[in-house]
Regions:
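Cytochrome P450 proximal C-terminal region
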Residues: 2-21, 41, 73, 162, ...
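Conserved cytochrome P450 catalytic core segment spanning the I/J/K helices
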Residues: 146-150, 171, 186, 217-218, ...
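N-terminal membrane-proximal hinge/A-helix region immediately C-terminal to the signal-anchor transmembrane segment
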Residues: 2-136, 157-164, 235, 364
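Cytochrome P450 catalytic-core helices
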Residues: 185, 291-316, 414-432
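Cytochrome P450 heme-binding Cys-pocket and its upstream "meander" loop
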Residues: 63-71, 110, 270-279, 384-419
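Hydrophobic mid-domain F-helix/FG-region of cytochrome P450s
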Residues: 20-24, 86-99, 123, 140, ...
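Cytochrome P450
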Residues: 2-21, 83-90, 149-160, 169-191, ...
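Cytochrome P450 I-helix active-site segment
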Residues: 39-45, 49, 155-159, 206-217, ...
Length: 433
């Protein structure tokens, strides 16, 4: 009897597999027939179902565009069609088109991350929602970041955590810098968002869950128990539960007077539901945790290979320290004097490529120059191509912070990260070689 059940279960599995394969193949043929030769960019659609996804995601050094993009751009040009993440796609390595895509969010394009990512990010994440809900959640995040970056309380937290972390290194022969800096960024986020101190057990629990979360974020998105993806989905659920418990505790205590963290501000406004509040807190924690930590690790790597840059950076921070009293804390005016530090951060962002590309989808037919981008197609603006374009950057493979002579406009989240990194670097370069 057991063998018979196993036989039928295998037959059903194969049947569902064939039906799924057929559906995706017919969908692909339908979309292509709906857009026959409408000035589509040249390109290759690759294999059925997976298309060219595996080749596109093949690991490569962060200071290059990788063999896939190099080969396709040399054959098809800077803009080409492909089949990626189970969808027909337009890949753009053209700086002008990339800017056009980013400047026309919600008008011509919307976020379109693969469905399995929703299981990790959550259905209300800023990366997965669109339209009015996206605007609503984004406005909350932007208001928090804009109000936080220059407040004495936030600046004091950044400096205090920087100093305490480096103090903890003194009795150790070696450290794992990437782990240490992730601990620094998550402790800073939970302190400023939720008033949780680094030494509290819950802070360590949140760090562990975020580490598990990130392993699944870049893994094969198949939910099989024990895989990185399945563990990440569970970690996200635990993080949501942790934040939800804190929210309900605050509400039960009638929002403790004087706490003044981000969660208190949201709860007092009463503009978000509980699930929206949980999601926006986790989104800000994710952005402040992974991208900031990765960028800071890259900066240390680049400085180790550029002694002249390190020396110039050290001189800038020595001058700032000499202008202050002993143990006088850094302030917003000090940050504004860190001009070369800002250039180092911008150059590390260019050379390190923390964010290689983003997922977008055309919500209507879009004509750009001689190309047509059909409605419903995935659009992937690739930023690394512009970062290493010799027409935009002289000697693009060289780490040269002095190339940044113009103040670039960055998103509010990037500005917050720059403050954290600048204060951390201040104490790092003055205390370590």
């Amino acid at each position: 009897m057991g063998e018979l059940l196993l036989f039928f279960s295998n037959i059903l599995f194969l049947l569902f597999l064939v039906l799924g394969f057929t559906f995706l193949l017919l969908r692909r043929l339908f979309i292509i027939k709906q857009n026959p030769n409408k000035n589509l960019p040249h390109g290759s659609m690759g294999w059925p179902i997976c298309g060219e996804t595996l080749a596109f995601l093949k690991p490569h050094k962060s200071n290059s565009t990788g063999s896939f993009l190099q080969q396709h751009c040399s054959i098809y040009g800077q803009v080409f069609k492909s089949h990626l993440f189970c969808s027909p796609a337009i890949v753009s390595c053209d700086h002008e088109l990339n800017m056009f895509i980013l400047q026309n969010e919600e008008k011509y394009f919307q976020a379109s991350y693969p469905k399995p990512m929703h299981g990790i990010l959550g259905k209300l994440s800023l990366l997965t929602v669109s339209g009015d809900l996206h605007k609503k959640l984004r406005n909350v995040a932007v208001s928090f970041i804009g109000a936080s970056k220059s407040t004495p309380a936030f600046l004091h937290s950044v400096e205090k955590l920087s100093i305490s972390m480096m103090e903890s290194w003194k009795e150790r022969k070696q450290i794992t810098f990437c782990y240490e800096i992730r601990k620094f960024t998550i402790n800073l986020m939970v302190k400023h968002l939720l008033s949780i101190e680094p030494e509290e057990p819950i802070a360590f629990k949140i760090l562990e869950d975020f580490q598990t979360f990130m392993k699944g974020f870049v893994s094969l998105p198949v939910y099989i128990p024990g895989t990185h993806y399945a563990n990440a989905v569970k970690a996200r659920a635990r993080l949501s539960r942790t934040v939800r418990e804190i929210i309900r505790e605050r509400q039960h205590e009638n929002m403790r007077a004087g706490e003044g963290d981000f969660l208190d501000v949201i709860l007092k406004k009463r503009s978000l539901s509980e699930e929206e509040t949980v999601s926006i807190v986790l989104d800000i924690m994710l952005g402040g945790y992974e991208t900031t930590a990765t960028l800071l690790a890259l900066i240390v790597y680049f400085l180790a290979h550029a002694p002249a840059v390190f020396q110039k950076l050290k001189e800038e921070h020595r001058a700032i320290r000499k202008s202050k009293q002993d143990e006088e804390p850094l302030n917003w005016e000090d940050y504004q004097q860190m001009e070369f530090t800002n250039n180092v951060i911008l150059e590390a962002m260019r050379c390190g490529n923390v964010v290689k590309f983003v997922h977008r989808e055309a919500i209507r037919d879009v004509k750009f120059k001689e190309y047509l981008i059909p409605s419903g197609w995935k659009v992937l603006p690739v930023f690394t191509a512009a970062h290493f374009d010799p027409n935009l950057h002289e000697n693009p493979s060289e780490f040269n912070p002095s190339r940044w002579t113009v103040c670039n406009q960055l998103c509010p989240g990037a500005e917050l990260a720059k403050v954290e990194i600048s204060f951390f670097l201040h104490h790092l370069v003055l205390n370590y070689r």
